[in-house]
Amino acid sequence: MNTRRNFLQKLTGSLIALPLLSKKDYLESLNEIKSKKYDGPILRVAIMGLGSYGTRVADAMKDCTKAKLVGVISGTPSKITTWQSKYNIPEKNCYNYENYDSIKNNPDIDAVYIITPNALHKDAAIRVAKAGKHVISEKPMSINTKDGEQMVAACKKANVKLLVGYRMHFEPKTLEVIRMRTNGEFGKVLFFQGLSGFQIGDPTQWRLKKELSGGGAMMDIGIYSINGARYMIGEEPIWVTAQETKTNKEKFKDGVDETILFQLGFPGGAVASCLSTYTMNNLDSFFLNAEKGFAELKPSTGYGPIKGKTNKGELDYPHVTHQTVQMDKMAEIILEGKQPIVPVDGDEGLKDLKIIDAIYAAIKSGKKVSLSL
């Protein structure tokens, strides 16, 4: 599109993979995807892990143009039966956790979206890659850097794509803030604040079991502020400091963080101050302060409409179902070789894991920890 050329730039930030789109271009790209005239390739996806978020993704995929849910992998037979009926999944595309290696012999499945507890991502990704299928892992990509590196290596060896479910990387108001910052409309970035938290319920759920979650609030909700700081500032952090507090040691046992305050330093001088918590509700906001302006997203990562404003006024992009756009865009990445504005590949997931590892190390040592991403 001719108007797209207006935003072609030589970008220095590693977070930005493509020239950024104007509002008009973005809406045109969405309309192009939604066009009923589309007759290109379809990404055929099996979902592994049929819980609440897996259901959300499956429902969103009903409206996809370039991606289609065609298979399931679950350890619960009753869930498979329910999904077969609800989403019209053929028996030949249904697998359990023992036999899904045989997916390699199924030409009707292109990719597997892993939506299991965090600690299970690594082994599942390696098995899926060995079966020759593309891997989409829900965030966090894994529970630590070592496991993440093994996932990246396995997918490279198998010559398959590894993507991470960073739905906000395709959200229009988020992308508009990134466009404005990249174009220099805010001037030098000085400060970022990220608040990510909610009161978690059931104390027996897997998110509060270290052996399954790999941590606590940081792995689940705090990663949004890490990721947001990176793409809104447009640089990679070079140091981190962090402090942890716990008010309920029975619910939040050793290795399961309740509340963490952390700070990230960036090479251009900007500092991010972030909060990750499982104890406080109504915490879902990003704020960017710069020499010539500001940007605020509040809510910043929730499923409902994202709301945003800058020093130039309200951001009035239309609400989109995040997972629908995410899966259509991931289909373009896998099948057409397109690159997203903000990366969603395994290397991107690995950077967040390195920062999380450094945050935990900073808490343990009480010292500033250097980063090299």
Task: Annotate the PLM regions.
Residues E250-T259, L264-D328:
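NAD(P)-dinucleotide binding in Rossmann-like oxidoreductases
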Residues K92-A154:
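Beta-loop-alpha module in the N-terminal Rossmann-like domain of NAD(P)-dependent dehydrogenases
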Residues M1-L8:
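Twin-arginine (Tat) signal peptide motif
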Residues Q150-R167, G187-L190:
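Rossmann-fold dehydrogenase core element
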Residues L11-N88:
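N-terminal Rossmann-like dinucleotide-binding module
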Residues Y53, M168-K253, G366:
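Predominantly a Rossmann-like dinucleotide-binding segment in NAD(P)-dependent oxidoreductases
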Residues L8-D39, A111-Y113, E332-L373:
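C-terminal helix-rich "cap/oligomerization" subdomain common to oxidoreductases
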Residues S137, I143, L162-V164, C274, ...:
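Hydrophobic residues in well-ordered beta-strands that form the structural core
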